[in-house]
Amino acid sequence: MIRTVTRPRQWQRWVYSSCLLQRAVPPAAARQQPRFTTSHKANHFGYHQPIAPVTHAPITREDDFVLRSVFDYPQFWQDFTSVPGGIPVGLFRNSFLKEPRGMLTFAYVSLKKARAVVAKVLAASSVTEYRLIVRDLDRLSDILCRVLDMADFVRVTHPDPEIQQNASKAWESVYEYMNELNTMTGLHDQLATAMANPDVTVVWSEEEKTVAEVLKLDFTKSAVSLPQKYRDRFVQLSSEISAVGSAFVQEMAPEQETVVLPSSDLRGMDPVRARDLTRRGKVYLPTLSGEAVMALRTVHDADARKHIFYASRTASRRSVQMLEYLMRLRSELASLSGFESYGHLALRDRMMAKSPEAVDQFLRALVESNRPKAMQEMAELLAEKQKAYPQTNSLDPWDKDYYSDIIRRPLRVAGRQGDLLSSYFSLGVPLVGETWHPDVRRLDVVSDTDGHVAVLYCDLFTRPNKSPNPAHFTLRCSREIFASEMEEVWEQTQQSNQKSMFGSPELAATDGMTFSRHGDSIKQLPTIALVCDFPQPSKHGDQPALLSFLQLETLFHEMGHAIHSVLARTSFQTVAGTRCATDLAELPSTLMEFFAADAAVLGQFARHHETNEPLPYRMVAQKARQTRRFEALDTENQIVTAMFDQALHSPRAGEPGFDPTAIFHALQRTHSCAPPDPPGTSWPGFFGHLSGYGSVYYSYLFDRVLAQRVWDVVFKAGERRAALSRENGEKLKQSLLKWGGARDPWKCLAEALDDDRLAEGGEEAMALVGSWGSTKPR
């Protein structure tokens, strides 16, 4: 019933024209380090009082200059925040988070609130009370997710170990209670009673009805309707699946930890890297390492590459056994819940595909549309091999990376200027917003029509012990809070020792965090965090943080998720922001990668950090051509992997003799143009995505196809500056992005793409999407 927002990449004018402070006509002189001061105070705990957000968004040259400089130059930021003033507040403005144990207090108070809501739902008996059940259950979910989502973020990103530890404890206590609720028959029965009464449902909005169906499905997946002993087994299985999945990823290992070869066999590899691995004339190459990947691309000796390939594609027997055990556990869980397979269980809820059969239609159509290009690329690789071996008529599995690297090499040389792209992408240029502190820059997102609409925290720079993986975290979803709830929370506050924490019912109902007013109700604003690992700007202030083109794409990708969270400000948090169909969640972020490479978009911000010269677009075009080389073969590999994921979560997982490795090899032979893995290898033991993305791996491909289609249809593939058209952006916003999970995603797509064939979804629609293909023309 209750779930956290999971997503284990700068605003564009088409989203909010006012959120992008557009560059005025650039001055001829180079950019200089600015000096600017304003009122701001930071305290020792890292929490701060930002300057008051504006309710409008003027687009001025001075604002553009200031906002870029806040990110580009450390000295500017020190001046910007050095003037005393303001009252220290909690982290994210949460009034509980003013000291290290604050997260524990927040969890305790939230659990108390949650229990009160549970009691209210269980006691409902009148039509009036039943009419409020969906809103009450959504509020219950929000109370718990406020803690879970925030604690999850803090425990993996905050630099203070004590705060991390307390966040972990808070998360564990609330997560345990959430699992109790998900199998609570009373809540399920009360919801079912409400949904079955026409006098109740007649007053529900369409969004409310959607939320009710989502909650009902969540209860069904938790086996809440089963007898007690089966519910107990369900909880036991769920716990074991979680533990085995984590162990599978953490303990993943190759059968052979190190490949030992004579140093003479590694001709072609970077001699410095090879020398570092050499002892007494032998090279000791770690099997799962960057050096092994490099060797497969560069070592001339085919036998040496063969040894490395076998080792890097053969997981340990224990890893494979853990995979098999995980699949059997999931199969049992699905059977216990009344589903034919785990795939049927996983795809029924919050998925566009709805069934394994529909996914199969998509993947089969996609592999067919991709095959001609993949075969062409294989022919190019074979022709390259035949230059050295004229008599050969086939490629070995360890040839693909080697010969594709040879073909790419001239592109890399021609695009050597691509290494200079970072000179045009300083971090302060793409981002817009208001304030920050040393670890987190706080940005207020302001709309020219709706005022203050979201809060965005950017933790973008590298630091010791920080995760290198880019991520988007939803710390709090949008939700509408009515006067009756505010009065209730305010009364509870007055009766407790929290009386002095909040100055109004609105602040008490939002834990002191940011909200917007809508008549008699308020909306808690989406609060989002973006985490990256970009290089720091120069401490001397002479050079801003410079991004490679890949890092720029990453930033745009993660901001795509943030855009979705900002636009989908629904009344119910259950369907807010990225809480949409799982196989739609990557569409906005993947789409943003097209904007990152668009000439008109780059022209808005990409200038040399020293000379202020605009970016020569040919440099980006060269980089894009290099990246897309052999794209079809890469896509084919992902298709086969997605098919493998579906097969693992099919009824076959519960059959005797279930053999994941044999299934994988058979799929390669049937659907791949590339040579299949040889017998004796066991790559499935390395398929770590199975832990968190079981049965939904196809989503990456699905959203890539959809993103390409949206770019081509809605934004006219960027022709005639269509990427900067507000009209185009408004269409995507109104048809798809603003709904979150509150509307049938197929109807959203049909409206966005002006294609009625998609409106009803199903297997035919999935096959149609697959037929569009996912590779871009070169």
Swiss-Prot record:
Gene: OCT1
EC number: 3.4.24.59
Family: Belongs to the peptidase M3 family.
UniProt cross-references to InterPro entries, sorted A to Z: M3A_MIP (IPR033851), MetalloPept_cat_dom_sf (IPR024079), Neurolysin/TOP_dom2 (IPR024077), Pept_M3A_M3B (IPR045090), Pept_M3A_M3B_dom (IPR001567)
Biological function: Cleaves proteins, imported into the mitochondrion, to their mature size. While most mitochondrial precursor proteins are processed to the mature form in one step by mitochondrial processing peptidase (MPP), the sequential cleavage by MIP of an octapeptide after initial processing by MPP is a required step for a subgroup of nuclear-encoded precursor proteins destined for the matrix or the inner membrane.
Alphabetized Pfam families for the sequence: Peptidase_M3
Keywords noted in UniProt: Hydrolase, Metal-binding, Metalloprotease, Mitochondrion, Protease, Transit peptide, Zinc
Organism, scientific name: Chaetomium globosum (strain ATCC 6205 / CBS 148.51 / DSM 1962 / NBRC 6347 / NRRL 1970)
Catalysed transformations (reactions): Release of an N-terminal octapeptide as second stage of processing of some proteins imported into the mitochondrion
Gene3D superfamilies from the UniProt entry: Collagenase (Catalytic Domain), Neurolysin, domain 3
Biological process, per Gene Ontology: peptide metabolic process; protein processing involved in protein targeting to mitochondrion
Transit peptide feature range: 1-37
Signal peptide (UniProt feature, chain positions): none
GO CC terms: mitochondrial matrix
Active-site residues, as the UniProt record annotates them: E558
Chief place where the protein resides: mitochondrion
Subcellular location: Mitochondrion matrix
Name recorded for this polypeptide: Mitochondrial intermediate peptidase
Cofactor: Zn(2+)
Annotated binding of Zn(2+), by residue: H557, H561, H564
Record note on cofactor: Binds 1 zinc ion.
